[in-house]
Amino acid sequence: MAKMNAIGIVETKGFAPLIQGADAAIKAASVDMVEWRQVGSGYVSFVIEGDVAAVRSAVDAGVEAASRVGEVISELVIPRPIDELDQTFDR
């Protein structure tokens, strides 16, 4: 299993802000999409990975874009996450 440099998570209320945010995040920096998932009660999130600076830049761009069309619930960047965290994602 490859070691992740950093992961970024953006959670939104509704699918349209998720798509807008994920699109902007992927275009803003050299990051890879790990997954998106329905959290429940209309909340959805996407997870990206890459180096720490790229993930931070991508999350910032994603939050800005998503907030233009809907509500951003939370955002998170984790540098050097533990290996076991990778097992929680649907790859």
Question: Model segments located where?
Answer:
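Terminal helix-to-tail segments of small alpha-helical proteins
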Residues: 1-91
